[in-house]
Amino acid sequence: MMDSSEHDYYEYFDEFRGILLYKQFIKYWDNVEAFQARPDDLVIAAYPKSGTTWISEVVCMIYAEGDVKKCRQDAIFNRVPFLECRNDKMMNGVKQLEEMNSPRIIKTHLPPRLLPASFWEKRCKMICICRNAKDVAVSYYYFFLMVANHPDPGSFPEFVEKFMQGQVPYGSWYDHVKSWWEKSTDPRILFIFYEDMKEDIRKEVLKLIHFLGRKPSEELVDKIIKHTSFQEMKNNPSTNYTMLPEEIMNQKVSPFMRKGISGDWKNHFTVALNESFDKHYQQQMKGSTLQLRTEI
């Protein structure tokens, strides 16, 4: 039997096709599954808290050919709709996307096997951004604290245990990143590391420009780097999620743009927690060629 705190924890989530997912998303799943992709759609896929907003803004700037004003006209969650996001009140990713002109940029946290079939049929390009598990766990913990429809995550070590067992929305980080990594041999899929973007943003921006078939210029790259720096995005209402009401995202508890660094896990993991995490990590990632850096 579940104790009351465990019952509270699962109030908003349910097991769905092998992962934990928000009940509201599951309720409207048929609309996601039936979604019709267009050949020029671009999918940005990532496990939550891996740098999705950052790479989305970089891509928006590439599409806008460096026009900052154009990118500031609307919130990132309207420019890059969140495919499977749906609730009874105000959010409907599928509807947003259906009403959008091409080319569309589409955000998802789904693993490849749950992505609507039409994306594969239409041979859409996809960008997957991946971040080291420890920093993701830290960021996810703070996300739980500040976003509505999330239970109390408990203490940080308690939350990390849930994270390790895949008992968080979108399930196991390990399964998620391994499944996208296996897909990345496909030339239509670009796999990008958060840590590489932190270390050499110019190199990664150029990689993205080439992947998207655009012409690079020094001026364009400079504009993108400036506009998508952490400080710029933290202060930009169109990227920092302050356009969402406080009852959805309470940034007084923790800002959406919190630190934007690699290695913040060192400020949260005790030696013992780190040791057990590393042991579990090695078991989960055994046999995978995917290598991530926990610091730069």
Curated annotation (Swiss-Prot):
It is found in: Cytoplasm, Cytosol. Adrenal gland and much less in liver. Detectable only during pregnancy in uterine. The gene is SULT1E1. It comes from Cavia porcellus (Guinea pig). Homodimer. 3'-phosphoadenylyl sulfate binds at residues 49-54, 131, 139, 194, 228-233, 258-260. Sulfotransferase that utilizes 3'-phospho-5'-adenylyl sulfate (PAPS) as sulfonate donor to catalyze the sulfate conjugation of estradiol and estrone. Is a key enzyme in estrogen homeostasis, the sulfation of estrogens leads to their inactivation. Also sulfates dehydroepiandrosterone (DHEA), pregnenolone, (24S)-hydroxycholesteroland xenobiotic compounds like ethinylestradiol, equalenin, diethyl stilbesterol and 1-naphthol at significantly lower efficiency. Does not sulfonate cortisol, testosterone and dopamine. May play a role in gut microbiota-host metabolic interaction. Inhibited by estradiol. One of its GO terms (molecular function) is flavonol 3-sulfotransferase activity. The N-terminus is blocked. It comes from the Eukaryota. The keyword Metal-binding does not apply. GO terms for cellular component: cytosol; nuclear membrane. It catalyses: estrone + 3'-phosphoadenylyl sulfate = estrone 3-sulfate + adenosine 3',5'-bisphosphate + H(+); (24S)-hydroxycholesterol + 3'-phosphoadenylyl sulfate = (24S)-hydroxycholesterol 3-sulfate + adenosine 3',5'-bisphosphate + H(+); 17beta-estradiol + 3'-phosphoadenylyl sulfate = 17beta-estradiol 3-sulfate + adenosine 3',5'-bisphosphate + H(+); 3beta-hydroxyandrost-5-en-17-one + 3'-phosphoadenylyl sulfate = dehydroepiandrosterone 3-sulfate + adenosine 3',5'-bisphosphate + H(+). The active site is at H109 (proton acceptor). Its main location: cytoplasm. One of its GO terms (biological process) is 3'-phosphoadenosine 5'-phosphosulfate metabolic process. Keywords: Cytoplasm, Lipid metabolism, Lipid-binding, Steroid-binding, Transferase. Belongs to the sulfotransferase 1 family. Its EC number is 2.8.2.4. Signal peptide: none annotated. The lineage of its organism: Eukaryota, Metazoa, Chordata, Craniata, Vertebrata. Changing N267A: Decreased of sulfotransferase activity. Increased KM for PAPS. This is Sulfotransferase 1E1.
